[in-house]
């Protein structure tokens, strides 16, 4: 065959490839898409015996189409594996990286474990060292899988490699993304000093070395979210306020109508085509951390208001595209609102919303959300059982929570509630054992100031029940010192009302009144019906002692009102179909039918995401409350 004939044949084949690809794309983008004909066009390419690169790319495209538009996962896998086997040995050919990334996603969808996905990505990371974009993208994807498997040290190491690679390529924006992602992983590991060092380093780069103002604002939001979460994890509600305010201002800037689209901001340079979360999801996340802050500070009305707004925003985003991260946000918000409801005495609403959280978890593919939130759900059901005086059920729920979770704060929280159950059921041996264990585990390790304040509160409650009033005062003053330092209003009100009861028990009515008055003022602001019930009983006794008949009557009337509200709510609880959840101790939670969660909560209405975990723990907002020291 002559050279001219060969050239002519090649040109003819190229024309066929281009025509078939164009036709395939036409069918894919038709309204509605004609995927069958699109696949037929791509399949026809193979009849021309195309060159290796064309063949590999076509197999990749077939895999992409099958994954996106059909349920034929096995055929998608075959095409992707073929694309990988052809492209892997070919130098300077990006198809291998795209294929590896997709194959890893497919393995995660279909395999029982992540071993194959990790192996595929590790090989692709090795091969991509001369391609900074793909090297960084694959490192992020692999670190995400390790983080999801709670292999945090490996995830952290990969993110450190990514930061170095970005630095060597002078990709400053990308380097900061890696630094902040690593800070998030270290936060989960409770390596507080390392977190601070990384945040400080990233903060200086954001301030001084990011010339693009829009990218700078995005990084600032990521940085501030981590800073706020860092302070909240330490229970530092007062310290966090300036950072939270700055975060709220930054998100308003990003959500303004004149703000450019993500595609405009991140589409110009390949090494800047990475965002942590799209701005619409960041908006929900800022609501979420605001809810967490309001809960810890003891502002239940605010927490409810922001939860409702966030859930409304989530429903709007779900209507556009139901991203898995939205379900994560929804579950965490529901976990917070459940605690709100119980503090305010709305336990029937609380069990409805626990059921709603269960439904979201059960709807996620492969029960992935249920695995991550099962311990939290057991903990919430334990609190609900405790508040409805089902102590045996509550104990079993907390024991399951402790056995399932690896989060130390959640474990501490559940153990403190177990201690209160043992206190109320007069199981002194079990109580001593759990308090000793909590003390040993948390003396020399990092813990939330709110939770450690709660630990002192439980010890004060224990001393009060033993009639060791001097010891009770010592513990409760320690609790008050910690609570007042960081404006932990619920911890303050609980400590004050218990301290008032201590003084009442030793006949010091003046000091008792000095404690119960601010306790009731705080409780009405929160509002916390349990502290109000307890405080009104103390006030009734104090006014009787001082022979103040009218004030005694008023206090008694208030006590009856709070008590009747709780009794009426208790009646609704036991009649609710969702009440059956108290009997869930293992496996999948039972399906219960009943009224949905409060209607107001369920109102209707490219860049690469470096989607490392967003929220490390959903238990940070839990604080002590209740007449007998229940924790919410």
From Swiss-Prot:
It is found in: Nucleus, Nucleoplasm. It comes from the Eukaryota. TPR repeats lie at residues 453-486, 493-526. GO terms for cellular component: chromatin; nucleoplasm; nucleus; SMC loading complex. Keywords: Cell cycle, Cell division, Chromosome partition, Mitosis, Nucleus, Repeat, TPR repeat. The keyword Nucleus applies. Coiled coil: none annotated. InterPro entries: MAU2 (IPR019440), TPR-like_helical_dom_sf (IPR011990). The keyword Cell cycle applies. Its main location: nucleus. One of its GO terms (biological process) is maintenance of mitotic sister chromatid cohesion. Required for association of the cohesin complex with chromatin during interphase. Plays a role in sister chromatid cohesion and normal progression through prometaphase. Interacts with Nipped-B to form the cohesin loading complex. Belongs to the SCC4/mau-2 family. This is MAU2 chromatid cohesion factor homolog.
